[in-house]
Amino acid sequence: QYIEEYLLGYCQRHPLIDIRWGQRVVAIAQGDAAVTLGIDTPDGEYELTAEWVVAADGGRSTVRKLMQLRMEGRSYPGRFVIADIKAKIDLPTERLCFFDPAWNPGNNVLVHRQPDDLWRIDFRLPDGETEEQALEPALLKRRINAVLSMIKQEVEWQLDWATVYSANTLTLGKFVHGRVLLTGDAAHLLPIFGVRGINTGLQDSNNLAWKLAFVINGWAERPLLDSYSQERVQAAHEICEEGGKSTRFMTPPSPGTRLLRDAVLSWSLSEDFLKDLMHWRTSRPHDYRDSSLNAFAEVDREFHGGVACGQPLRNIKLAANDHLLDAIGSKAGFHLLLFVGKEGLTGDLREILAATENLAYPIHRLIVTPAAPLDDPQADPIVGDAQGRTYSKYDASPGTVYLVRPDLHVCARWRRANPLQVVQALRQATGFAEGCCLS
């Protein structure tokens, strides 16, 4: 797993991260100011106390079980085998899906390429078959050979890994429980049918990390962490709903659902309107349009396009090998996008730059100009957009301002802004009371 290797390497190099192998959480107790964990090791048990605990311990989360937290949602009938094999297979890099194959009637098979000549084969088990039966080596080998024969790739292969799983669309009702914050599969369980399993966990972490950092550093109020739960539970519900549709399409739970699915498949190559029924809806990014961190809703509605409050920034190509997000890079903190005309910075925009100059937390001001990049020490950096692509995609004109959270979701925007509005929007985006902002 390259991602895990890269993350582990980063953690090992970071002076503030301590990795403790071979240790298990066996107890958890919360107080008003800290959480105490009971840790079991080969050398005995000890206690570890921290201000906050982030539980990212997977679908079988020990922390979730110790806290007796129950998930809500649905578990679907049917069990599936995932088998990763190493083989030289001459097929393009795309996901192949087969419905009702001759060797596995009434079920389906997924096949797709992974790095280093690894191929993932995923198929549904016949009803009533146990996990032990499904993973019996001789039977598993016959089924993998049947898949390879079906795709006309009867090659030598080696089994890398195999397991059995069930499809679930389950989530906790909230992800923040006192000083314990749950994320990833510890907070929700999603089916694999295009439902962004690991991506959803990364989005959880991206949402939580900056908020926890702001609270720990005293830059934000503790209610900011409640917005993590609000936003990500809503995202989990959306993904569960879409994942449920995909799961019912892949494994119809009733004869009527199967009849509809088969009709869609049979007509899909000739009837264009049916393609929308097979669209991977979860490829759309989630937007936090109902977030309590968004400010100036009335002003946001004045726009006729662009990136609305709650939506993630759009990356715009400015020139060959030059994009808008390149200018933002990996800088931590809030971002202000200020759009200027050929005349450069106006008085209001200069006042906004001055008002955000010495905040306690990091904020980066990016000026977008249609002319050659300006030489202005107040901004970092300045982006030249001679083609006007950013102006068009952001429905911007000279004087337009976008306020962007550290996780790159827009939380306020104005056709014309003044310094007081920007500062008040920053207060709301850092967890201070709602309703403090002008409109």
Language-model regions: role of each:
Residues 1-278, 283-287, 366, 436-439:
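Core Rossmann-like FAD-binding/catalytic domain of the broad FAD-dependent monooxygenase superfamily
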Residues 5, 9-14, 146, 214-439:
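Helical substrate-recognition/capping region of FAD-dependent monooxygenase/halogenase enzymes
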